[in-house]
Amino acid sequence: MLTQLPNPISVPSWWQLINWIADPIGFQKKYSKKYGNIFSMQLAGIGSFVILGEPQALQEIFTQDSRFDVGRGNTLAEPLIGRTSLMLMDGDRHRRERKLLMPPFHGERLQAYAQQICLITNQIASEWQIGQPFVARSAMQKLSLEVIIQIVFGLADGERYQQIKPLFTDWLNMTDSPLRSSMLFLKSLQKDWGTWTPWGQMKHKQRSIYDLLQAEIEEKRTKENEQRGDVLSLMMAARDENGQAMTDEELKDELLTILFAGHETTATTIAWAFYQILKNVNVQEKLQQELDRLGANPNPMEIAQLPYLTAVSQETLRMYPVLPTLFPRITKSSINIAGYQLEPDTTLMASIYLIHYREDLYPNPQQFRPERFIERQYSPSEYIPFGGGSRRCLGYALALLEIKLVIATVLSNYQLALAEDKPVNVQRRGFTLAPDGGVRVIMTGKKSLKFEQSSKIFN
């Protein structure tokens, strides 16, 4: 480890940790102003990290992925997602697992999932009442969880379907504030002394989720001859070059990773999108006009190709990164990054926030302006909502598809407005960042249903 990392923050490590947990965006704003876009923080009890907000540094990292370990940099997430999650793997093991997991999230499978997303969106939105305010993020959490349960697990009814929804929601809500999130960062709070302690409650709920996942895996094995298109069935059928399937432990950890990563992030992004769309009349009108030109019952994949809808989704992901940084990368040997000579075992974290708010890349970065993504293309080191290199989010295509289709379906069929005329701040929620208060909206009217897909795609 270097005795002197680039531009170290000169305050006690315990104070850095408190501020990082409480407000990671404010933390980066403050210290980037003082030290520039490359600086080092030391979090008491966790370690030292070099924060990178320079596209050139990211390009150097993404093009030299083999010189870094990412799995061993994600140990903070292990208690949540299990030790055999793809996020905790490196080298050949990571390549094997990623290859096994890739097919369900790309290609023709997306077309089948698209129709189901539109259907689920209308089912959830039909519960909203005219004139009755609701929290957009909570509604999108419910919607996103339904998408994952139906598309990933292939469940649409039954006892297991009813059990997993409230259980998983309760599990995630245990870290719904900076204070409650602190147990993810402080080992001293990770004591399983039964359900009367927060960590004990979290682990108890996690074990219950694992039991439900195991039961679903075993039931699917009894129906291996059935042709099913859900993600879990495709994962179970996948084989590596040696003919080996994923173990039950790997399957459960990957399912929990998908639930954890896909549910939280997508719901939060859609809530932010509605906040900005409803706040900016010009954006809403332009988007509505684009959607209206499609006519009745458009093909979902046609919707996903709409340029302004795509730009709105991209701008939302730029302004509101769900994670404050990309996952840590640990140097395997001495390496030069952005002019800094770094020793082996130096931990680097690319700052999504610092990259996405650079004035030279995104003029007036505080302004919600989707047109910037129509006017120019950004390189993989200039726009990083889903990461980069060999560690780019595996499910990014499905996530982006869901974001677009939910926005389009809701705006085409329902009239919404913000319930409160006040700014919405960013708040830590576990490892992620979410709108404080969740974005309160109100339905002011309904339109004749434009997207009326009504058939389930999984048997």
UniProtKB/Swiss-Prot annotation:
One GO BP: nitrogen fixation
SUPFAM superfamilies (UniProt xref): Cytochrome P450
A molecular-function term among this protein's GO annotations: monooxygenase activity
A Pfam family hit: p450
Coiled coil (residue ranges): none
EC category: oxidoreductase
Keywords: Heme, Iron, Metal-binding, Monooxygenase, Nitrogen fixation, Oxidoreductase
Record bears the keyword Heme: yes
EC number: 1.14.-.-
Superkingdom of the source species: Bacteria
Swiss-Prot/TrEMBL cofactor(s): heme
Keyword RNA-binding applies: no
PROSITE patterns per record: CYTOCHROME_P450
UniProt binding sites for heme: 393
Its job: Probably involved in alkane/fatty acid hydroxylase.
Family: Belongs to the cytochrome P450 family.
Name of the protein: Probable cytochrome P450 110
Species per Swiss-Prot/TrEMBL record: Nostoc sp. (strain PCC 7120 / SAG 25.82 / UTEX 2576)
